[in-house]
């Protein structure tokens, strides 16, 4: 279903924060715990993360309310979270309650981390970027943080869904940009049968 708020919003970092703040205030943000489609999406992400390997040192970009963070904390050797919103970090910390997790309030386009990671996960984040060069820069940041034998798990609604919401770069567009630096090794499509419930989850490695 098209969301008029998304169509009308100025998607600067401040605009993204304003847009997401009201969703984070809900008891079950984005219906992640109660929606079958969201559960399938989380399952596919974890399946791609864990397929045939350990997670090692993990970077999660965009934690929302912590549903994926909670799962990653169980399987990772170390877990670092980069999130744009203070409110999202607080919500995720309340849910996960793990003092070993490292939290950074940063923009994916301007990440400043002195580390390398075995697994980087970035889902439901990159479609908020509306300039191709900023998106290319965010992807380059991710590549630079990924170890040579690491894996990048990417997830996003498909192009048609994102465009119906007023976003320019959905899953197919991001993956096309990413393939100059990364190769796709596995890809899943999740379709919940309702408007807006159509996404891609992909595993990529460095070229």
Curated annotation (Swiss-Prot):
GO terms for molecular function: S-adenosylmethionine-dependent methyltransferase activity. GO terms for biological process: methylation; oligosaccharide biosynthetic process. It comes from Azorhizobium caulinodans (strain ATCC 43989 / DSM 5975 / JCM 20966 / LMG 6465 / NBRC 14845 / NCIMB 13405 / ORS 571). Its EC number is 2.1.1.-. SUPFAM superfamilies: S-adenosyl-L-methionine-dependent methyltransferases. The lineage of its organism: Bacteria, Pseudomonadati, Pseudomonadota, Alphaproteobacteria, Hyphomicrobiales. It holds the Pfam family NodS. Gene3D superfamilies: Vaccinia Virus protein VP39 (3.40.50.150). The keyword Methyltransferase applies. Keywords: Methyltransferase, Nodulation, Transferase. InterPro entries: NodS (IPR020944), SAM-dependent_MTases_sf (IPR029063), SAM-MeTfrase_NodS-like (IPR008715). This is Nodulation protein S. Disulfide bonds: none annotated. Belongs to the NodS family. The keyword Transcription regulation does not apply. SAM-utilizing methyltransferase involved in nod factor synthesis.
């Amino acid at each position: 279903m098209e969301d008029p708020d998304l169509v009308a919003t100025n998607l600067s970092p401040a605009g993204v924060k304003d847009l997401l703040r009201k969703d984070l205030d809900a008891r079950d943000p984005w219906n992640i715990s109660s929606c079958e489609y969201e559960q399938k999406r989380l399952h596919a992400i974890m399946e791609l993360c864990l397929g045939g390997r350990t997670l090692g040192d993990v970077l999660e970009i965009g934690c929302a309310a912590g549903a994926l963070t909670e799962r990653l904390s169980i399987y990772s050797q170390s877990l670092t979270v980069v999130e744009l919103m203070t409110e999202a970090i607080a919500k995720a910390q309340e849910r996960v309650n793990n003092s070993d997790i490292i939290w950074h309030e940063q923009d994916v386009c301007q990440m400043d981390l002195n580390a390398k990671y075995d697994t980087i996960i970035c889902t439901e984040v990159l479609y908020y970027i509306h300039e191709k060069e900023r998106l290319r820069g965010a992807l380059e940041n991710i590549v630079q943080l990924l170890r040579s034998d690491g894996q990048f798990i990417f997830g996003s609604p498909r192009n048609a869904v994102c465009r119906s919401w007023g976003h320019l770069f959905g899953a197919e567009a991001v993956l096309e940009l990413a393939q100059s630096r990364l190769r796709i090794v596995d890809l899943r499509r999740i379709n919940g049968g309702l408007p807006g419930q159509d996404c891609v989850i992909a595993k990529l490695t460095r070229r």
